[in-house]
Amino acid sequence: MEIIFGQNKKEQLEPVQAKVTGSIPAWLQGTLLRNGPGMHTVGESKYNHWFDGLALLHSFSIRDGEVFYRSKYLQSDTYIANIEANRIVVSEFGTMAYPDPCKNIFSKAFSYLSHTIPDFTDNCLINIMKCGEDFYATTETNYIRKIDPQTLETLEKVDYRKYVAVNLATSHPHYDEAGNVLNMGTSVVDKGRTKYVIFKIPATVPDSKKKGKSPVKHAEVFCSISSRSLLSPSYYHSFGVTENYVVFLEQPFKLDILKMATAYMRGVSWASCMSFDREDKTYIHIIDQRTRKPVPTKFYTDPMVVFHHVNAYEEDGCVLFDVIAYEDSSLYQLFYLANLNKDFEEKSRLTSVPTLRRFAVPLHVDKDAEVGSNLVKVSSTTATALKEKDGHVYCQPEVLYEGLELPRINYAYNGKPYRYIFAAEVQWSPVPTKILKYDILTKSSLKWSEESCWPAEPLFVPTPGAKDEDDGVILSAIVSTDPQKLPFLLILDAKSFTELARASVDADMHLDLHGLFIPDADWNAVKQTPAETQEVENSDHPTDPTAPELSHSENDFTAGHGGSSL
């Protein structure tokens, strides 16, 4: 078995044509753009955690039945500094980098001081975000990197802190029908408060305000929620939205800010400053988008760890939301590279299997309701919300399915009643070996698998003009533990889950995390421009001859959604 995790991957800078078997639907024209860690060793130094690896972008351009593949490392400041030094010099969440041992004591002391309030990495390895006419590689720090989706060139570095007060931000924003972006971040001890900030980025900017600036630079705070702890805010990877509400889980998987501030001096990583409190609760915050204020009732559930929200919607006076939940934080621990050896598949076991859980939260609590009564009147779920003596509401979920991760949906149904979830099947081992279609209504599933194959997150692309929720295709980049088998792009019929085609690539492809599909409806005569604040090298780099230019119509793309780096 070939080791998949932790290997350095080679870039495929020029497009290489894939070998297509089967038949690609004629309507499927566009680019699948994905992101994930691709380099874990720099010189003699190694990252500790798989999620620390340097970002490697890759794309599949699908046109007229042909597929072209290319990949390129994100030219972040982190990447450039590491490569120039031929060692890891910028800290990641699971790996602390240290000053040159040849520096004198005064230089070392200054380094310790500067790391007390760390300037986080711009190694944006988790997802791709569409914002107006621009595309950005994203991570969970305050930095995002603008990229050219055709050439995979790295453009502008953007610091969220210049526009909204956040030190951390999710890589799983939401998009409304107009193309506006809604995201969340954490503001640490800002003016004496630690808070969770929901912010909005407009899809377009009025000409009077544009002045060459991207919509990100017109981001504004939508609302904020005070953290229950000033110095131990909750870690979160995603959030949910309905047509009228935002769903945020303040879970007992926490960041210890004091420990993070002293991590560099103590010689430990920032990841070691996270802890899961089994004795605490998970608090459910429901924010009304119309008033920009939280619903006043206190909702909570048992302690759990959630990385990915699946979807949320309103029904019969309740907010229903679906998440992938764990009983503990063991998933993150398993992805330390020391654990990712040849015995990984056989010996690595989660202490908690990921479960698909549905919660129902009543929007209006009857003050006269009896203590202990179930406030949920929705017939479609067995989830409960029990009124307590102090007026708080204890929510217990309906468990829909056990053993899945990396969930995706038909994004046209985001925030609305829906039926289908597409995900990677994950049992007690965190290795994804199957792609799953789960039918919430019938509680049935369809699966795809192939020996020695590890699928990436399955992404749904709808058939143009589709009326059925599952009318479309599933795209997944597949890598193999068999060195004799080429990696390939898998295309499934989303209804039947049968294989339509695959495009095998003779290239060094990595196991990625998240991304999006850009239909050719978005490609036109407007070229992505370099940043106004920095000069982009290689501006005369030739574009992919298989791709037209980009015009960025607002809604004709399939977005990453709310979903550490999973």
Swiss-Prot record:
It holds the Pfam family RPE65. Changing H174A: No significant effect on beta-carotene 15,15'-monooxygenase activity. One of its GO terms (molecular function) is beta-carotene 15,15'-dioxygenase activity. The keyword Oxidoreductase applies. Its EC number is 1.13.11.63. Changing E450A: No significant effect on beta-carotene 15,15'-monooxygenase activity. One of its GO terms (biological process) is carotene catabolic process. Changing E469A: Decreased beta-carotene 15,15'-monooxygenase activity. Symmetrically cleaves beta-carotene into two molecules of retinal using a dioxygenase mechanism. Belongs to the carotenoid oxygenase family. This is Beta,beta-carotene 15,15'-dioxygenase. It comes from Mus musculus.
